[in-house]
């Protein structure tokens, strides 16, 4: 009788271990798939996630790029959108015309690519925010940016 009891306990432990191993394996596969999509610049804290792959040439410093974007605060509040205005936004990449997080986050994008940029305050609007505007001091910003054109 004791042998059957111990055998039952061992069987339950083995089944639970196999279940947990299989679940962990699925999570590892999912993380491996996402690894190519999400990156973080260690020195700046910028996080990027590719939402849609692009094609063609990559945007480089000195290029004039045209994008559509929507900006959010961490709580999900939308504060700006070129899509809502129906007018794309163009700027010279890497020249400081935009916040540093944009210069870093848009660099390397391909035409047609859509990225999520998570920009810490240090490379966003910092401790000043946008006085009288929608971005509070020390805000982490989230942008969805689609690269439309490189000139």
What is each stretch, according to the model?
Residues 1-151:
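Cross-family detector of peptidyl-prolyl cis-trans isomerase
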